[in-house]
């Protein structure tokens, strides 16, 4: 989701940009319509443009969520051609049984949806999430506005890779923060040519 759903608090610093009440089950079909993925990307680009108008000189893209290492691993598999085993980590500390299930779900999602690794929008709409779409848009928007943007974490680096596949020149504005403990991080960072500054053992 791109908003805090049913929050009892009014907080002007939080920008709610809902694309719907969650994505669909990627193990059964596409996560969202292609036009919804495009809308998410454009929303992120708009946020970056607004930041520039507000006088912001550097952006940072991170995330807070549960379950989004699953979609990020699926997206990275599609973009990189790497096997599920190579890019999938335990996320929030899964048990062995849950970790096995996670990998099976990703395998099934890729088999059912057959995302085109040469088309990042196809990948995002089939096996991505609203968060990844918006984050990719922020990366693209930052580059368009010539703003440096910090890439923070696994989900962020996968979104950055989507952005760079849409516009190769965008990667010149990306700054790596820390090396995520998630298995696929180094693969995505290598594909981006990103060199993170810190090793903190964080996911």
Which stretches of residues belong to each language-model region?
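Glycine-rich, mobile lid/loop segments that gate access to catalytic sites or pores
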Residues: 19-68, 74-83, 91-95
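Generic secondary-structure signature for well-ordered alpha-helical cores
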Residues: 42, 46-53, 78-85, 104-115, ...
